[in-house]
Amino acid sequence: MEYKYNVTLLLLQVVLHRQQELAHQDKTLSQISLLREPVVDTAVLERFSAHRVVRLYAPELCGLRLEELQAVVREVFARGLAGSAEDTPVTLITLANHYYRLRVQELELQELPKLKELMESAAGLRT
């Protein structure tokens, strides 16, 4: 299922933060493998589903079970990096960079023009 770029980016950020916590808590865990095959546990579920961005833009994700969130993460990884070189590894970091770039493009091409139009129409109403 496709979600807004900001929601997917938030999910990747929450998962990345959790992988960093796990790597610091347990030095036997490989940071590289955590970036390629992240652990999605209840801590990720609680942080993500309670976040205000999720409540605002994807409220259907607030009631997810752990298995469903794990499936969402697997789906994001399976989609990969559209438009990137084939030899680019799919990791939490490369995915986050990819979705960050998509979100910036979305803001520049869609959201900012809408805001500009609203401001211009509001300014026109005042005169």
UniProtKB/Swiss-Prot annotation:
InterPro entries: SWR1_Swc7. The keyword Transmembrane does not apply. It is found in: Nucleus. Keywords: Activator, Chromatin regulator, Nucleus, Transcription, Transcription regulation. It comes from the Eukaryota. GO terms for cellular component: Swr1 complex. GO terms for biological process: chromatin remodeling. Pfam families: SWC7 (PF17330). Component of the SWR1 chromatin remodeling complex. Component of the SWR1 complex which mediates the ATP-dependent exchange of histone H2A for the H2A variant HZT1 leading to transcriptional regulation of selected genes by chromatin remodeling. Belongs to the SWC7 family. This is SWR1-complex protein 7. It comes from Eremothecium gossypii (strain ATCC 10895 / CBS 109.51 / FGSC 9923 / NRRL Y-1056).
